[in-house]
């Protein structure tokens, strides 16, 4: 198979972890006789510094004409510490999602046998956890009207959803549940929010189309609690943008390290794959960042091209590196810590 992949390294540790994912992907392509052409493009703070736009038109054109996008990280503290900044790196990610039609974020949460004791939660609570979040990405409060009134002393952010937006996200959720454990949980706050009531009634109306799927409805605060108490009780979770943003980060600690969790953002056309961790600017250029989440994001990419054996090869070599302790300092726990580039080389060599 020939694949054209847009490569958006982004900011902070993004370039370093992306480099390792490329190494591993190229090793997979060589082993399984595929051809990958990589097409680098700027985004985030790097793009602001270069052209003044966190998601330039040139970057969009490269992404839109590619089979998939592999993305590193976005963000820089100089923007975080400047509330007056009109242009911010994160605006590039929001713009990219909107313009590429990436309306659903797929965020798996699972455990690694060799790292189960690194989780802050008890082994018996989390062992065997295998759930996936489907978070709506292009609607809700992040994209609603916002502003200030009363000389800046009053602020507002509007949350708006259409039935069509909920339906397309829920459809993917039901389809995913059908291919997994046939359980779907819709997370909302329907006791107080009108948008949540729209979510609930829309999903309820779709239930009859998927009679094999067991559907439940839970308030977001209850789910935040149950994710800590018994995450194994969930299979597929669908939710709106803000709730999903918070819950997926909460769930990321189940595995023991945010540096291990991959994700995908999907729509009707191109798909984007990225680690869930941030840009970690204090580690940038030090060759110490954990690349495994980015490598596993590449595995998700292969899987979505129906290259399941290739995806499994990546997951197997990642599990092997964890079991044998060939890891970066965040996972070393007093043992030998390897550099980001060394981990990437080892993974590629052992594919």
List PLM regions with ranges.
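Glycine-rich phosphate/nucleotide-binding loop
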Residues: 45-48, 228-326
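Glycine-rich phosphate/diphosphate-binding loop of Rossmann-like nucleotide-binding domains
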Residues: 6-23, 28-29, 151-221, 233
């Amino acid at each position: 198979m020939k694949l054209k992949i847009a490569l958006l390294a982004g900011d902070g540790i993004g370039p370093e972890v992306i480099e390792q994912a490329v190494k591993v992907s190229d090793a997979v392509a060589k082993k399984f006789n595929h051809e990958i052409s990589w097409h680098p493009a700027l985004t985030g703070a790097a793009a602001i510094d270069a052209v003044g736009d966190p998601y330039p038109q040139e970057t969009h054109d490269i992404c839109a004409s590619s089979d998939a996008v592999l993305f590193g990280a976005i963000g820089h503290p100089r923007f975080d510490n400047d509330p007056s900044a009109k242009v911010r790196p994160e605006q590039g990610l929001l713009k990219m999602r909107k313009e590429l039609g990436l309306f659903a974020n797929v965020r798996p949460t699972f455990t690694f046998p060799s790292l189960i004791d690194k989780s802050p939660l008890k082994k018996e609570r989390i062992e065997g956890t295998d759930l996936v979040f489907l978070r709506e990405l292009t609607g809700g409060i992040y994209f609603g009207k916002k502003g200030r009134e009363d000389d800046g002393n009053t602020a507002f952010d509007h949350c708006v959803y259409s039935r069509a937006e909920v339906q397309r996200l829920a459809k993917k959720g039901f389809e995913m549940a059908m291919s997994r454990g046939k359980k779907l949980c819709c997370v909302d706050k329907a006791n107080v929010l009108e948008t949540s009531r729209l979510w609930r009634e829309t999903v309820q109306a779709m239930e009859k189309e998927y009679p094999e799927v067991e559907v439940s409805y839970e308030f977001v605060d209850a789910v935040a609690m149950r994710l800590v108490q018994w995450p194994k009780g969930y299979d597929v979770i669908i939710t709106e943008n803000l709730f999903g943003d918070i819950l997926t980060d909460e769930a990321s600690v189940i595995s023991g390290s945010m540096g291990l969790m991959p994700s995908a953002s999907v729509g009707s056309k191109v798909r984007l794959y990225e680690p869930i961790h941030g840009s970690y600017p204090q580690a940038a250029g030090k060759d110490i960042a954990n690349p495994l989440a980015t490598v596993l994001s590449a595995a998700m990419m292969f899987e979505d091209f129906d290259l399941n054996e290739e995806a499994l090869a990546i997951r197997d070599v990642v599990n092997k590196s964890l079991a044998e302790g060939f890891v970066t300092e965040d996972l070393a726990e007093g043992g030998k810590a390897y550099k980001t580039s060394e981990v990437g080389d080892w993974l590629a060599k052992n594919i």
